[in-house]
Amino acid sequence: MTLSIRALDAALGAEVNGVDLSQPLARSDIEVIENTWRERLVVVFHDQQLSDPQLISFSKNFGELDPPGPNPYGQPFLKEHPELNVISNVVQDGQPIGNLGDGEAVWHADMTYVDVPPKAAMLHALEVPPPEAGGNTYFANMFAAYESLPADLKTAAEGKTAVHDASTNSAGMLRKG
């Protein structure tokens, strides 16, 4: 298969086709994917069947992985794969297998509460509700948002920083520790 790229929107997003992420990729394909991500900010790969180790292996092509925060009980979601966060509303044997899957996570930016946020996040969606049931995931181009600001607002924002409180998670639950 030949790798192909299709832009999704003027502001951001590209669809990458002709690649099987469950298999090791040629360095040239990884470079095309990374350059596409840097230019388009969001990259979508449809119909990928990945095991947890395959997802981790693909992710490591782009740098060291940042550990996600612990689950509400202070533990990794998957002891055998602490690099992964499980977002799910599925309950097995009376215990949730993940968190934030019942609509608790409102509009947010992943891990902006850490001093040096990760350069990217990967989402491997296995089962998603239809859009009319709240199954949408949205992305925003903050570079374009900044560029569209009037000059006086850009000047007012220059040199400013924000502090994101890490005491609660995206669902508003107090973090352990």
Per-segment meaning from a language model:
Residues T2-G177:
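Non-heme Fe(II) oxygenase catalytic core, chiefly the N-lobe of the double-stranded beta-helix
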